[in-house]
Amino acid sequence: IEMAAELRTFLDGPRAPRWYEAGAVAGVLDAQSGAAFQKQSLFRGAHTPLAPPMAMDVVDDMDGRRIEATVTLGLAYEGPPHGVHGGYVAGMFDDVLGATQRMMEKPGVTGRLTVHYRHITPIEEELTLRAWVTGDEGRRIVAKATCHAGDLLTAEAEALFIRVDFTEVQSRMAARRDPSPNPSGA
């Protein structure tokens, strides 16, 4: 088993840096870490083999600033006949809503995501997802989004994001993997 583990290290190659290692300063993400996050995104990342080619833009208009994304999903994403799997629809919403709240100063992590499915979201048709921030108070950011196939509203979502210190989150999660005893007893 040890030999297999050693061989595995050669197959895996050097460890890729994680997106948050790219440039969080004082717990706030910078442009470099944001760009790294996009490359590693499960739903649109160039470094993620299963991610569909989702185009995402920031749009400024009379109603304010929002994110608009377009994507066409093929058979690999099918759930119901001719429709996108609902879990994937929810995941796309989380990704698009997350991008929206990252336009704010000090973004956060998803605290709640509510999805309302209005119609089966079709595969092999261009989908448009639009997301915007509706509330920003203290540590809480609220954002909403819609998914359309042409003029057809297929789903809508609302998310609550909680602002966190990403440096602190990284430290706490890394400590969970550290087998050394905690000297503070906490």
Language-model region placement:
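Hydrophobic residues in beta-strands and at strand termini
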Residues: 71-73, 117, 163
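Catalytic strand-loop segment that frames the active site of acyl-thioester-processing enzymes
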Residues: 41-84
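Hydrophobic beta-strand-centered segment that forms part of the acyl-chain substrate-binding groove
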Residues: 2-9, 96-128
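HotDog/MaoC-like acyl-thioester-processing domains
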Residues: 1-34, 121-123, 134-186
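Short, low-complexity Ser/Thr-rich regulatory SLiMs
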Residues: 58-60, 119, 133-135
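Short Pro/Gly-enriched beta-strand edge/turn motifs at strand-loop
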Residues: 35-41
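Hydrophobic residues positioned within well-ordered beta-strands of beta-sheet architectures
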Residues: 67-69, 113, 129, 143, ...
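Active-site helix/loop of acyl-thioester processing domains in fatty-acid/polyketide metabolism
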Residues: 59-66, 84-107
